[in-house]
């Protein structure tokens, strides 16, 4: 039935059952029904009286506004403070999508406090551009981001056309089957849901490599997965061609593969190969007759080779042994330095100890001997193996099936890997799609993409600015852990963590301190029992600690209290169906999310881990400390609804500073 005293014309109520009513807008033009609200009878009618639904005259988007929050015009009050948006005209503010009824209020704002008070009452797509203007972003950049239809004529009565411009807030259900699919979709489907505001980024053809930055929770991995699917769809008429989707760890590759299988059809998935880059390269080298075993630092054979090499250390320089391992990892390997002459010339920017050419000449025999020992043992480190893979593929004219490569967690992938990735596909449209965030770099790999032959400057660089996972309160806590730290943008420039925000709000993270482990564990158990009593599933809760040994202690305490746990090991996946509070290291939960996260044992000497920041080189120590801070930042941003942080004994300096 029609609601005659509704704020908007042509508003009707639909009876759902004896209690609930739906509020539906039926515009005069077109065969369109817009479900606006569902509530109990009286509340639904009250909502219809308070809310106006109109088409914005400039952006053409449909906006729903609660008119009870609009302040009536009043006599101007003389205020000494300058206006927040004094640099812009009312027409410019209107062009950003601000509803006409809010223009006067917005132009009168004097600070961000007043602006933040409008967040809950203005349409999100109207408030966000104002937030970015207040943060200092260029007006034209904000306009292009939020008003892509600015040059198109707008008919404020044509709701069917307006729907096409409003996909961020509205979805057109074409038939009953689609509606049922949406209503019955499992949680896993929503986890790979692409926000409509990101669809343009996913589906826009590119003339070359694209880099996408964004803070934790902004949907980078979801964007990457949808990009892979879009690229796969374009290969339907190109038999044998594939999309390579690569990430840094085996765990993340397994999680992404599982999510892509939920997102893609069987045919689309058959054209996407999801891999951990190290494992992929090792397999390819074996297939093409590579005669060396690829090893990591922990390998015993590699350790013996290194100890032999240290016998070449020039005692007169007085440098500690860890200087040589850091020099190898930070300078020699990433820059593919293979000769004394190359080492004398290579840039050492970022190292704390300056070296003359004479000192470099004395140091080089250590690295030369190490490579000789590794060659005798038929061993190769990953960096050398990647460099040799490029040469081998070229010499053997290896034809790989990939037309495009999608790279996730790019901040943890080093220069050797990116140089290899660049060599795997020819420079062409849609060749590379790279997503990452320097604020989440938890491994000691740093890259400047331009030095790897990957040009992402200018319009080839995009940034996601809305956090869809965590609350603003959790985001602020996590960002605060990195206060005062300069973070790179994967291409040698600085990236900010202040230009993204969360639209969700909740409780501030709960931080507790205990005198000993027993007291801390008891507090955690009590908090988890309260969550379980409120119908939170055990598998939606995760306790994470710095090390495996640490989280196993908490698991034991929970088990003793009758709470089931499930360990997320290095090579184990996470089945959402299996009950049990998830237990994991902070490294393991990278890329995952949980409704509630407990950061446990955040003690002095544990986070940051003492041995991780023990370098004698002040620059190395600074970088290692950043990795530890980033690790805590990453762990905190896994929480969707609530974050709990606890310590016992002396708390971590990261908590006290925070």
Regions found by a protein language model. Name each.
Residues 191, 195-242, 248-293, 356-359, ...:
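Conserved helicase motor core of SF1/SF2 NTP-dependent helicases
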Residues 157-196, 203, 213, 319-403:
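Accessory N-terminal region flanking or inserted into the helicase ATPase core
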Residues 76-133, 289-359:
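ATP-hydrolysis module of ASCE/P-loop NTPase motor domains
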Residues 1-15, 575:
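A short, surface-exposed loop/turn module that caps and links secondary-structure elements
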Residues 12-133, 145:
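Enriched for short, Lys/Arg-rich terminal
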Residues 15-19, 27, 467, 592, ...:
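A short, compositionally biased micro-patch
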Residues 64-94, 98-105, 110-111, 125, ...:
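Accessory/regulatory regions of helicases
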Residues 115-174:
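Interdomain "pre-motor" coupling segment immediately N-terminal to P-loop NTPase/helicase cores
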């Amino acid at each position: 039935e029609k609601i005659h005293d509704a704020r908007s014309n042509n508003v009707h109520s639909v009876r759902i059952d004896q209690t609930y009513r739906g509020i539906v807008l039926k515009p005069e033009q077109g065969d369109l029904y817009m479900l606006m609200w569902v509530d109990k009878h009286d509340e639904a009618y009250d909502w219809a009286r308070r809310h106006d639904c109109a088409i914005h005259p400039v952006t053409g988007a449909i906006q729903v506004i609660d008119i009870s929050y609009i302040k009536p015009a009043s006599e101007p009050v003389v205020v000494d403070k300058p206006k927040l948006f004094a640099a812009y005209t009312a027409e410019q503010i209107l062009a950003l999508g601000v509803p006409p009824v809010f223009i006067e209020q917005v132009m009168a704002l004097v600070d961000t406090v007043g602006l933040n008070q409008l967040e809950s009452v203005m349409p999100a797509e109207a408030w966000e551009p104002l937030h970015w203007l207040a943060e200092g972003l260029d007006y034209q950049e904000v306009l292009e981001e939020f008003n892509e239809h600015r040059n198109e004529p707008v008919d404020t009565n044509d709701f069917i056309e307006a729907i096409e411009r409003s996909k961020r807030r509205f979805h057109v259900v074409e038939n009953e089957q689609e509606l049922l699919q949406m209503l019955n979709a499992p949680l896993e489907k929503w986890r790979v849901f692409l926000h409509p505001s990101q669809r343009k980024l996913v589906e826009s053809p590119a003339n070359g490599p694209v880099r996408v930055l964004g803070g934790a929770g902004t949907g980078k991995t979801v964007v990457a997965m949808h990009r892979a699917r879009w690229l796969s769809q374009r290969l339907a008429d190109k038999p044998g061609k594939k999309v390579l989707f690569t990430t840094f760890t085996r765990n993340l590759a397994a999680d992404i593969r599982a999510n892509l299988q939920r997102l893609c059809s069987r045919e689309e998935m058959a054209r996407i190969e999801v891999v951990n880059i190290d494992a992929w390269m090792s397999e390819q080298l074996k297939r093409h007759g590579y005669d060396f075993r690829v090893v990591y630092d922990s390998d015993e054979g590699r350790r013996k080779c290194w100890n032999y090499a240290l016998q070449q250390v020039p005692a007169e320089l007085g440098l500690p042994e860890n200087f040589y391992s850091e020099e190898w990892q930070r300078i020699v390997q990433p820059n593919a330095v293979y000769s004394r002459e190359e080492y004398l010339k290579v840039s050492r920017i970022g190292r704390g100890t300056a070296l003359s050419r004479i000192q470099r000449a004395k140091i080089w025999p250590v690295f030369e001997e190490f490579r000789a020992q590794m060659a005798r043992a038929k061993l190769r480190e990953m960096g050398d193996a990647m460099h040799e893979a490029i040469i081998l593929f070229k010499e053997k004219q290896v034809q790989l099936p990939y037309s495009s490569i999608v790279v996730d967690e790019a901040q943890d992938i080093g220069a050797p890997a990116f140089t290899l990735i660049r060599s795997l596909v020819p420079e062409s449209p849609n060749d590379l799609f790279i997503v990452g965030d320097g604020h989440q770099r938890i491994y000691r790999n740093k890259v400047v993409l331009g030095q790897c032959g990957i040009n992402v400057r200018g319009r080839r660089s995009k940034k996601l600015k809305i956090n869809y996972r965590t609350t603003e309160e959790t985001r602020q806590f996590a960002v605060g852990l990195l206060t005062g730290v300069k973070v790179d943008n994967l291409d040698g420039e600085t990236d900010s963590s202040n230009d993204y925000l969360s639209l969700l709000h909740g409780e501030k993270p709960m931080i507790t301190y205990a005198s000993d482990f027993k007291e801390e564990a008891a507090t955690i158990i009590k908090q988890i029992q309260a969550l379980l009593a409120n119908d939170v599933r055990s598998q939606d809760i995760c306790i994470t600690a710095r090390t495996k040994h640490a989280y196993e202690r908490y698991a034991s305490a929970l088990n003793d209290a009758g709470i089931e746990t499930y360990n997320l090991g290095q090579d184990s996946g996470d089945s959402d169906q299996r009950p049990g509070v998830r237990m994991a290291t902070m490294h393991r939960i990278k890329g995952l999310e949980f409704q509630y996260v407990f950061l446990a044992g955040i003690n002095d000497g544990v986070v940051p881990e003492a041995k991780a920041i023990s370098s004698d080189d002040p620059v190395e120590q600074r970088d290692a400390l950043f990795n530890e801070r980033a690790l805590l930042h990453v762990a905190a941003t896994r929480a969707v609804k609530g974050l709990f942080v606890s310590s016992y004994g002396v708390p971590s300096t990261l908590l006290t500073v925070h």
